[in-house]
Amino acid sequence: MTDTVFSNSSNRWMYPSDRPLQSNDKEQLQAGWSVHPGGQPDRQRKQEELTDEEKEIINRVIARAEKMEEMEQERIGRLVDRLENMRKNVAGDGVNRCILCGEQLGMLGSACVVCEDCKKNVCTKCGVETNNRLHSVWLCKICIEQREVWKRSGAWFFKGFPKQVLPQPMPIKKTKPQQPVSEPAAPEQPAPEPKHPARAPARGDSEDRRGPGQKTGPDPASAPGRGNYGPPVRRASEARMSSSSRDSESWDHSGGAGDSSRSPAGLRRANSVQASRPAPGSVQSPAPPQPGQPGTPGGSRPGPGPAGRFPDQKPEVAPSDPGTTAPPREERTGGVGGYPAVGAREDRMSHPSGPYSQASAAAPQPAAARQPPPPEEEEEEANSYDSDEATTLGALEFSLLYDQDNSSLQCTIIKAKGLKPMDSNGLADPYVKLHLLPGASKSNKLRTKTLRNTRNPIWNETLVYHGITDEDMQRKTLRISVCDEDKFGHNEFIGETRFSLKKLKPNQRKNFNICLERVIPMKRAGTTGSARGMALYEEEQVERVGDIEERGKILVSLMYSTQQGGLIVGIIRCVHLAAMDANGYSDPFVKLWLKPDMGKKAKHKTQIKKKTLNPEFNEEFFYDIKHSDLAKKSLDISVWDYDIGKSNDYIGGCQLGISAKGERLKHWYECLKNKDKKIERWHQLQNENHVSSD
């Protein structure tokens, strides 16, 4: 294809010269019709380089493309990790026992089916029957998950199973979309020094010493056709992935092919497959340098290019590969097989791509310069990106009611609709769990039952938080999460929604139908998640809320019975207790002590509730004491965690009496004032001074 400018011709289309063809002109004949270069803008003819602003725009696009590839690699890594976890958690041998759950198979056990892929025996619960063939085919859940990974990672197309590298990397190059170049041995226009030395290596001194009349080959490190933009940058992972496709085609002739690949930055995403695979046609190895062509950068002998035929015309750009006679043209346009470069700027392009019969795309050589990594904040935001989040997560319908008289919050989970499929069969095993923020823990976690194999579950369950005060309603937020239960691995998060309880009016039920949002459970900077709406993961403020460590609450009832002549103390329940055992729970019980000491009859304790942070006791204790003496007494209530073989752990306590303050004093005073009336109050447990449990 000719690059010569015919300023004295009015015809926009031209055919290559029909003079007797030389050996080097066969390529030109194959080029066919071409755009007349006289239609180029004046700026391109003058070879003006890109401005700093344009280079910055290109840099940002390239950096974003590279970051998206890294995020895609991490997404595939998560899929592979899930598959590996399923393989590690197998419980059977696949012969006499189910390969997944380990259940006995055969006459005395469950029905047995054989997986079509791995040929292992599985039970019907762990196998899935597919009906896409004439006869039924059974697959185990591991093989179904493996097929899912192949489908979602693109491995089915590339015939490879990506694990640690990108499935199909894009060669990231710090180049601008430039003009295709013609045959070598054309005079080169001197170009100014590059303004970004970190992206382009220094040019040799030989170029500066050349006279205006000399016609020399280009320096391999320089790229005038790029507008002095830097050489391509290639990551190690990309080089590994594309090594198999370039084993049979080496462009490294005498070190002069380091610049043979020039894809426009705008096409890296769209042409990822074409840019890294050879053309379907025959691959031609380039011929060694001809005697009439420059073989070294310092050569000054002109070749029989277009400039030799038209000495009065100036070529537009200099040749780029002095060691090759036919530089690959598919790479210059970002496509394969002569497809034009879509999306490249027209004022930077002078000709369409070369013919399909040219040599296939070659991978660029590694460059010395590399773009600096993005800032840490951008890296953190990139890690939170999930390319699967384009699909909707579903909607959840629920209602809330704050019962102010009973200090309880009722959350009725009604149903969900259109949940994101999480299993290989296109369904999910959803359940809903609730947390109160700040201070989310097992103590304030409630959950519904799990519904199997559905994306539109209907629960109609009411979950109740006891001991919710007006103060809690002002500062607490309810987090409602929908998860998928996984029998063999970790439960997977589907989506969530949050509601600030201060917006809820007492004793008025409020209904909601809200779309779920995706939230990564980690503390993030405010700027990173500012676009996530009400599902922005709030800072856990356990340490900030009054600097008080929450130990839990206890519901106590007091009544002085004139008929029995004594005080009746009721221990009803505790909520949100602190976890004291390694399993995240406690084995709580409650001790009562009426002070000053009245002997053994002054001490009582409840039964022990195993492995719970929200125990329900419903026990009453009687103290035989006169009403006149009760005002001088104080009731010490303490909650303990029972341990075997060592001393019990103190969880928290409170003291009711004349010397108490706030709600504790008010509760004791109302008991003395209102005889034969049971008065219930919630009290906050505190880590007060206490004696050892007996």
UniProtKB/Swiss-Prot annotation:
CDD domains, sorted: C2A_Rabphilin_Doc2, C2B_Rabphilin_Doc2, FYVE_RP3A
SUPFAM superfamilies in the cross-refs: C2 domain (Calcium/lipid-binding domain, CaLB), FYVE/PHD zinc finger
Compositionally biased residues, Polar residues: 1-12
Domain named RabBD: residues: 44-160
Compositionally biased intervals (Low complexity): 177-186, 352-370
Membrane topology term: Peripheral membrane protein
Post-translational modification: Ubiquitinated. Deubiquitinated by CAND1 to prevent its degradation.
Binding residues annotated for Zn(2+) 2, in chain numbering: 115, 118, 140, 143
GO MF assignments: calcium ion binding; calcium-dependent phospholipid binding; inositol 1,4,5 trisphosphate binding; phosphate ion binding; phosphatidylinositol phosphate binding; phosphatidylinositol-4,5-bisphosphate binding; protein-containing complex binding; selenium binding
Role, per record: Plays an essential role in docking and fusion steps of regulated exocytosis. At the presynaptic level, RPH3A is recruited by RAB3A to the synaptic vesicle membrane in a GTP-dependent manner where it modulates synaptic vesicle trafficking and calcium-triggered neurotransmitter release. In the post-synaptic compartment, forms a ternary complex with GRIN2A and DLG4 and regulates NMDA receptor stability. Also plays a role in the exocytosis of arginine vasopressin hormone.
Protein's UniProt name: Rabphilin-3A
Gene encoding the protein: RPH3A
